[in-house]
Swiss-Prot record:
GO CC terms of this entry: cytoplasm
Reactions listed under catalytic activity: S-sulfanyl-L-cysteinyl-[protein] + uridine(34) in tRNA + AH2 + ATP = 2-thiouridine(34) in tRNA + L-cysteinyl-[protein] + A + AMP + diphosphate + H(+)
Keyword check for Nucleotide-binding: yes
Lineage: Bacteria, Pseudomonadati, Pseudomonadota, Gammaproteobacteria, Vibrionales
Species this chain originates from: Aliivibrio fischeri (strain ATCC 700601 / ES114)
Protein name listed in UniProt: tRNA-specific 2-thiouridylase MnmA
Name of the gene: mnmA
Length: 374
């Protein structure tokens, strides 16, 4: 085992069990470990779903238990400028963005890494993400071999989908200790070590904004624009409060349950399309409706982990949303900025604004933003 005692790692301490165990494991591996807690949202600190104070207290308790120093940093301005404004613009345009991916790109692996470098003199940063990475030898690096990002060992928790915007240079500076473990093992280690976060539930909801009623939250920043819900034939069957509150393939929240379709069809209703020009939500019946199906997609804002654009058709797999089963597909380059993706089998609810992330077996190649379905 290599001597890590001269290498400093700054761990992103979120106040959760994954970052807590990451810090412990790195300590056990001999690194000089320090923690850094990020505060990235200040709009409604006093509301009941803001857990920043509790999370900081838990992070501090874990660091005290492990005997490591905890730094704090406020990235709220960077989060607003580089993540949240994009999030709002995409919703305004009728698309469904994924702010967690942008948060990883702009905050956790950019602003955080820069602060860890410039202020804390870090050799590495570490996060509690469920991904793995390769460690090329010095000889391999000299021959141009770059670190690769791999899926997490726990397929149910794998978070590589959210990290596809990392470059191989960022991967080289990052450690992911829990990526080599399954979640129950992480909780077991936390309990064995007496860490306060051992039984703390996993956070869900928008990155750094927490768990809250999404419609109510979005309505604080974007004015609602109610309109009709129609069938593909143009029959008005209900009202929506705003296209931004709905995503393709959505079933819940349409409030048209019990409405029968043509010929007395009682199949459930799904969001099939958004007509932005008319501010109309098109609802269809049955998850196999043709409007829900796509043969492929067009993607832009491409990012490849090794920074090498794909120049020729490539057979691989793709995820168009988190925790989706891999979809066999072929990537067809249009140019360095755009690709066409053809699925082996038609897919349901491919959503513009979301990310398409590509894999070759365990390796995450990168991805792009879905512009349209085809």
């Amino acid at each position: 085992m290599s001597d890590n005692s001269q290498k400093k790692v700054i761990v992103g301490m979120s106040g959760g069990v994954d970052s807590s165990v990451s810090a412990y494991l790195l300590q056990q591996q001999g690194y000089q470990v320090e923690g850094l807690f990020m505060k990235n949202w200040e709009e409604d600190d006093n509301e009941e779903y803001c857990t920043a104070a509790e999370d900081l207290a838990d992070a501090q308790a874990v660091c005290d238990k492990l005997g490591i120093h905890l730094h704090t940093i406020n990235f709220a301005a960077e989060y607003w400028d580089n993540v949240f404004e994009y999030f709002l613009e995409e919703y305004k345009a009728g698309r469904t963005p994924n702010p967690d991916i942008l948060c990883n790109k702009e905050i956790k692996f950019k602003a955080f890494l820069e602060f860890a470098d410039e202020v804390l003199d870090a050799d590495f940063i570490a996060m509690g993400h469920y991904v793995r990475r390769t460690f090329p030898t010095a000889e391999e690096i000299a021959n141009g071999i770059k670190p690769q990002m791999l899926r997490g060992l726990d397929s149910n928790k794998d978070q590589s989908y959210f990290l596809y915007t990392l470059s191989s240079e960022q991967v080289a500076r990052s450690l992911f200790p829990v990526g080599e473990l399954e979640k129950p093992e992480v909780r077991r280690i936390a309990e064995e070590q007496g860490l306060i976060t051992a039984k703390k539930k996993d956070s869900t909801g928008i990155c750094f904004i927490g768990e809250r009623k999404f419609t109510e939250f979005l309505g604080k920043y974007l004015p609602a624009q109610p309109g009709n819900i129609e069938t593909p034939e143009g029959k008005v069957i209900g009202q929506h409060q705003g296209l931004m509150y709905h995503t393709l393939g959505q079933r819940k929240g349409l409030h048209i349950g019990g409405t029968k379709g043509g010929g007395g069809n009682e199949d459930p209703w799904f969001v099939g399309e958004k007509d932005l020009k008319r501010n109309v939500l098109i609802a269809v019946q049955g998850k196999d409706h043709p409007l829900l199906k796509s043969q492929g997609l067009l993607a832009s804002q491409l990012h490849w982990v090794d920074r090498t654009p794909i120049k020729a058709p490539l057979s691989c797999t793709v995820k168009t949303r988190y925790r989706q089963t891999d979809i066999p597909c072929t990537i067809i380059p249009v140019d360095d900025e755009n690709i066409k993706v053809i699925f082996d089998e038609p897919q349901i609810a491919v959503t513009p604004g979301q990310s398409a992330v590509f894999y070759l077996d365990e390796v995450c190649l990168g991805g792009g933003i879905i512009e349209e379905r085809i």
